Amino acid sequence: EVKLVAAACITSERADLGVRVMKAGKDYFVAKAPFTTLEQLALIKQTIQETGRKYMVHYSERLQVESAVYAGELVKGGAIGKGIQVMGMGPHRLDAPSRPAWLIEKEKYGGILCDIGSHQIEQFLYYTGATDATITESKIGNYVHPEYPELDDFGDASLIGNNGATGYFRVDWFTPDGLSTWGDGRMFILGTDGYIELRKYVDVAKSDMSDNVYWVNKDGEHYINVQGKVGFPFFGQLILDCINRTENAMTQEHALKAAELCVKAQMLARKVV
């Protein structure tokens, strides 16, 4: 018997599919972004309440990146005190001809802040412990892709969590051809007693190994490469959550709140070019 349905369809169609799945008595696990409008979010929440099923989201830049998993362990273990600010950078390589057409149609992919920005806001909430946030500023632009007028090739946003933590992130489609991987993803986590830097996919001009973790605290300066050493505990936890009806992998509230804030950031964004 099928108990969990996984999907990565067109972004704007993910909510409708999820509602059908939940009404059929199954849990749903979907690629980010899990929806593109607040109306879809309202329908998702209503269906969750009616069915008791799960609508889980694959925020892969934390859940499937070992350095990000390790950073979570450092934060939870008190290595840098309380997380008070997160700054993220999520550059990507576009290579538009290799991508499906819907990925550059705004109504379908939701815009850059809704799409790849979802990774960043989810990590902000996770590392700071905030359960909600206010978008204080957001911007989008299309700098060099006039042939794709609905594409945002740049976006950034600032936010303040309901616990006082602050966040900033930048996402873009400007990875240069000379980089050895699809994007030089970075994350900076400031705590009250130290800070962490993640060089997720490459350590530029030093090593092509992914999952580089740097941190500084009262005990000194630290570095570890965790590629192949940490694993991805989320997936096993999710399976157990579906079986036992628990919320150890990720709470439903967190999964939806991260995406809600991304949609709001996109809606509020000032177009700079």
Regions found by a protein language model. Give the residues of each.
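Beta-loop-alpha module in the N-terminal Rossmann-like domain of NAD(P)-dependent dehydrogenases
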Residues: E1-T47
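C-terminal helix-rich "cap/oligomerization" subdomain common to oxidoreductases
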Residues: L4-A7, K54, N162, Q237-V273
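A short helix->loop->beta-strand "cap" motif at the edges of active sites that frequently abuts
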Residues: A24-K26, E50-K54, A165
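A contiguous active-site-proximal alpha/beta segment in oxidoreductase catalytic domains
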Residues: F35-A96
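Mid-domain beta-loop-alpha active-site segment that forms a flexible
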Residues: H58-E66, D95-A133, P149-D153, H254-A255
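Contiguous beta-strand/loop segments that form the cofactor/metal-binding neighborhood of enzyme cores
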Residues: E122-V204, F234-N244
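Short polybasic amphipathic segments
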Residues: M187, V204-D219
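Active-site loop of classical SDR/Rossmann-like NAD(P)-dependent oxidoreductases
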Residues: Y223-G236
